[in-house]
């Protein structure tokens, strides 16, 4: 950064948030009222300006019960008396969206589902029996494979009529109606069973069978199942069960002591391949593509067809998630006078515009290791979230930090993490996490707890004060960023797993080199890039957006660009603008 007062923007209006450490406060024990008050006073004494009430595994009072809200009310009142902020973590324990399991208990139709596929080659005349996990059959087709190994999704035999119910488990056990026979044979574990004999084909030809079912997700973290995060009705019910109940109990402090809601980890699930029964219809409506007919193109390379299908799939799933979750939660929070903050997987950076304080999950390291400032994982990219905070006029950029560093974490470790996050533009530090108790197994919940359990806690005001000053410095300065880097997210969407990994690694390596050489930059979502303007000033061509002007646009290795982005970039080039393209 340059200390040039003409270039720096003083933005004291952004300091209305209490800066410094704002820890998750894990409510993971008996939650005695006197202990709640005592721990809040401990935080206050060390300069901690606020906390996030995080119902956590191990909590001994029932979530969302009268006993629970009695304690929430006490914590809010104590914070109010001590001029501290309170944030409400919106789940028990995580990820957000299910109200401790209540959403799908009351509405099982909102259960999360995912795709399971069985793929098999079959020779002409061969009998094929395939078992797919129990669920609604979406696709059962045998595609005719030519001698050169190629095949078309338009040339197939429909196998739906060859599918029925079967079982995959045989059971032999002691059980019987009479004493004469105590041994019984049973079957279990329902499956969808396909039984088909392929017709004869020419020499060198064969069939490729795709058998795809829509399966209810099981064994999902704490809840066995999860919700359909693309279904707006499911998320509307989550808000009713969670946010509305907090409003009923402590709504009088919304916008005062209670500053907002923190949401965590929720995304379009399953994260590697989002699904919803609503998705095919929305892809058809928004993109004009029949997703079911083209499912194999999600997994295999059919050239341009795969590119179009994958883009339509990911773009639609992303928009559906934003509409179902982010937009609804943000709207509710704003209507009720509180902020919507948090961190979760980043499908594309434009989704961060809906957070009032956008966040990431990074910085879980100790001094002596190499700072992982840039990795392929968007959710850990501090520069991406700081860029979003800049472009979308957010008061801060947040990071959940200190997760799983271990009980040996020191204040030196914390300062080092804060420093490299600060370089990236992070000025709101959410510590993971302050334990109400570290008794018994609870000490193993992604430690440490940099709270009263630590031998250095008596000096914790030093690290709290440092974090506060760092945040104030960052919020009252303007970065001297001369480069604009276009997010290559849509190229990752349309690529196979290996290519996607390479593109993300290249994107991370580019950012690392820019920072290493002192070349500051912002990352911009292609959707936002389209809204910029090409201007000529002082004999130079600039790209203007958000009141800033950039001489150089950097295009990381990409495989495609959205139409609006392509034409805006082309306009900049034709006017004489500088574009640095990498491959």
Regions found by a protein language model. Name each.
Residues 1-10, 141-152, 160, 227-228, ...:
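Secreted/periplasmic carbohydrate-active enzymes, especially glycoside hydrolases
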Residues 4, 17-22, 26, 32-38, ...:
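Carbohydrate-binding surfaces of carbohydrate-active enzymes
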Residues 5-7, 40, 44-46:
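N-terminal regions that are enriched for targeting/export leaders
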Residues 11-24, 214-217, 221-237, 241, ...:
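An acidic-aromatic substrate-binding cleft motif
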Residues 54-181, 187, 216-236:
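Acidic/aromatic-lined carbohydrate-recognition and catalytic surfaces
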Residues 174-186, 192-195, 202-214:
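Surface-exposed interaction regions enriched in Ser/Thr/Asp/Glu
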Residues 198-232, 351-372, 554:
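Aromatic- and acid-rich polysaccharide-binding/catalytic face
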């Amino acid at each position: 950064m340059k200390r040039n007062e003409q270039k720096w923007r003083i933005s004291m209006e952004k300091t209305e948030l209490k800066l410094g450490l704002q820890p998750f406060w894990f409510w993971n024990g008996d939650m005695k009222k006197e202990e709640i008050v005592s721990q809040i006073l401990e935080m206050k004494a060390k300069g901690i300006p606020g906390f996030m009430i995080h119902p956590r595994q191990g909590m001994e009072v029932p979530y969302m019960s009268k006993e629970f809200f009695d304690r929430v009310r006490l914590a809010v009142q104590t914070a109010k008396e001590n001029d501290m902020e309170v944030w409400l973590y919106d789940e028990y324990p995580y990820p957000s969206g299910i109200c401790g399991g209540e959403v799908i208990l009351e509405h099982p139709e909102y259960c999360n589902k995912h795709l399971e596929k069985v793929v098999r080659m079959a020779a002409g005349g061969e009998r094929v029996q395939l078992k797919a996990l129990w669920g609604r059959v979406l696709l059962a087709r045998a595609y005719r494979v030519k001698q050169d190994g190629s095949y078309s999704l338009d040339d197939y035999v429909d196998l739906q009529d060859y599918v029925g119910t079967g079982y995959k488990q045989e059971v032999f056990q002691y059980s019987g109606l009479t004493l004469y026979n105590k041994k019984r044979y049973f079957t279990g574990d329902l499956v969808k069973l396909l039984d088909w004999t392929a017709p004869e084909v020419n020499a060198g030809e064969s069939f490729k069978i795709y058998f795809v079912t829509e399966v209810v997700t099981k064994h999902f973290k704490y809840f066995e199942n999860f919700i359909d995060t693309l279904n707006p009705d499911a998320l509307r019910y989550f808000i009713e069960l969670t946010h509305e109940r907090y409003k009923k109990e402590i709504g009088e402090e919304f916008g005062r002591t209670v500053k907002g809601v923190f949401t965590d980890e929720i995304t379009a699930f399953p994260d590697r391949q989002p699904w919803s029964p609503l998705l095919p219809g929305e892809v058809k409506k928004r993109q004009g593509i029949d997703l079911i007919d083209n499912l194999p193109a999600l997994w295999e390379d059919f050239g341009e067809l795969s590119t179009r299908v994958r883009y339509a799939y990911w773009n639609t799933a992303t928009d559906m998630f934003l509409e179902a979750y982010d937009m609804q939660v943000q709207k509710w929070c704003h209507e009720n006078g509180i902020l919507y903050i948090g961190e979760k997987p980043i499908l594309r950076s434009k989704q961060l515009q809906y957070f009032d304080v956008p966040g990431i999950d990074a910085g879980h390291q100790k001094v002596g290791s190499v700072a992982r400032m840039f990795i392929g994982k968007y959710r850990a990219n501090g520069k991406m979230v700081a860029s979003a905070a800049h472009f979308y006029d957010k008061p801060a950029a947040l990071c959940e930090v200190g997760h799983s560093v271990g009980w040996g974490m020191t204040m030196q470790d914390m300062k080092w993490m804060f420093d490299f996050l600060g370089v990236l533009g992070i000025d709101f530090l959410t510590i993971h996490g302050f334990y109400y108790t570290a008794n018994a197994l609870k000490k193993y919940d992604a430690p440490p707890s940099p709270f009263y359990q630590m031998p250095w806690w008596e000096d914790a005001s030093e690290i709290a004060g440092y974090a506060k000053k760092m945040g104030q410095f960052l919020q009252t300065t303007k970065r001297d960023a001369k480069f604009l880097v276009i997010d290559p997210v849509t190229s990752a969407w349309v690529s196979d797993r290996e290519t996607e990994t390479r593109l993300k690694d290249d994107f991370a390596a580019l950012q690392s080199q820019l920072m290493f050489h002192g070349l500051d930059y912002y990352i911009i979502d292609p959707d936002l890039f389209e809204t910029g303007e090409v201007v000529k000033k002082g004999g130079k061509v600039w790209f203007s957006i958000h009141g800033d002007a950039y001489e150089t646009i950097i295009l990381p290795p990409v495989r495609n660009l959205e139409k609006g982005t392509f034409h805006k970039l082309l306009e900049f080039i034709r006017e004489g603008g500088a574009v640095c393209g990498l491959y």
